[in-house]
Amino acid sequence: MTVVVEGCVTSLAEARECADSGADRLELCYDLDVDGVTPGTALVEAVVQAIQIPAFVMVRSRPGPFVYAPDEVAAMEETVREMKAAGAAGIVVGALTDRGTVDQEALRR
């Protein structure tokens, strides 16, 4: 079994430190005090240009529950496109129904 070491980072300095310490990939987010939200596009671009390991980007439009209204899901779809265009190797996202189950319809989009 191969173990993949992922560093959760919120800045270019943290990304460099994780990469230099041997991480296999990064999860790039912002504001860990609220369990993370989507970072700005400029940060994603800077990390992708400076770091040689894959950077996965959290797409979470707001703190709080992972239950999203249809308009929030649509906005997150656009954010996914923006993060991929900025060079993200992958996307980290989650969504739940109001019953607490995985919102497969939202995640398929």
Predicted regions: what they are:
Residues 1-24, 31:
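N-terminal pre-domain/capping segments
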Residues 3-7, 26-28, 55-59, 91-93:
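Hydrophobic faces of well-ordered beta-strands that scaffold small-molecule active sites
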Residues 12-13, 32-56, 70-75, 95-109:
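Active-site-adjacent beta->alpha loops and helix N-cap segments on the catalytic face
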Residues 18, 47, 83:
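Conserved, mostly hydrophobic/aromatic
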Residues 21, 50, 85-87:
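Structural motif
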Residues 63-68:
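A short acidic, helix-capping loop that chelates divalent metal ions and anchors anionic groups
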Residues 78-102:
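Ordered, amphipathic secondary-structure segments that act as subunit-interaction surfaces
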